Swiss-Prot record:
One function term, GO molecular function aspect: peptidyl-tRNA hydrolase activity
The encoding gene: pth
Cellular component, GO annotation: cytoplasm
Protein name: Peptidyl-tRNA hydrolase
Family: Belongs to the PTH family.
The entry's keywords: Cytoplasm, Hydrolase, RNA-binding, tRNA-binding
């Protein structure tokens, strides 16, 4: 069994924001399998899907981004899932909009949801998919209001192209592992 976690903030006012791109990827998977989310045994919503003989739990923490680790640990304990079987999907202000980057492990890189998961798990040895949200003309100093802002119409078009790729990469991770997914979905920056 694999656990694929999309990071975001639970209130409807955050829907469509750059910070909720992890939720967007997970929602895309849930919709494509026509499996709705239900409340879990912790502060999370989940949907269970099967793909190529692999059970996959899709998870949306309902704890807010900065406390995501609590929901992740609760789900890992409930489903008895090990670190090597999780993939965390989040936004990344350091990557250009419309790109993705898979890694087997690594630092939080300024992403507070990842930071809290690392704190709760005690190390950074879990797979993650970072989805780029940075605009070319966006100064990195004003990141807080930017990440919590809604996508512009142009950004929405870009996201509509990358979200299915992210969903496919999450399925690839689930069936074939992080190295395979990295080899197929990590592309050099243009």
């Amino acid at each position: 069994m694999k656990l694929v976690i999309g990071l975001g903030n639970p209130e409807s006012k955050y829907s469509g924001t750059r910070h909720n791109v992890g939720f967007d990827v997970i929602d895309r998977l849930s919709e494509s399998f026509q499996i709705p989310f239900t409340a879990g045994k912790g502060k999370y919503h989940f949907a269970k899907i099967n793909w190529r003989n692999t059970a996959i739990v899709l998870l949306k923490p309902m704890t807010y981004m900065n406390l995501s680790g609590h929901a992740v640990v609760a789900a890992m304990n409930f489903y008895k899932i090990q670190r090597q079987d999780i993939l965390v999907i989040c936004d990344d202000l350091n990557l250009p909009s419309g790109t993705l980057r898979l890694r087997a492990k690594g630092s939080a890189g300024g992403q507070n949801g990842l930071k809290h998961i690392i704190e709760c798990l005690g190390n950074d040895e879990f797979a993650r998919m970072r989805v780029g949200i940075r605009l070319e003309d966006q100064p990195l100093s004003s990141f807080s209001s930017f990440v919590l802002g809604k996508f512009s119409e142009d950004e929405k078009k870009t996201m509509e192209k990358i979200l299915p790729v992210c969903a496919d990469a999450a399925l690839d991770f689930s069936v074939n592992g992080i190295e395979h997914a990295m080899n197929h979905y990590n592309k050099p920056a243009a």
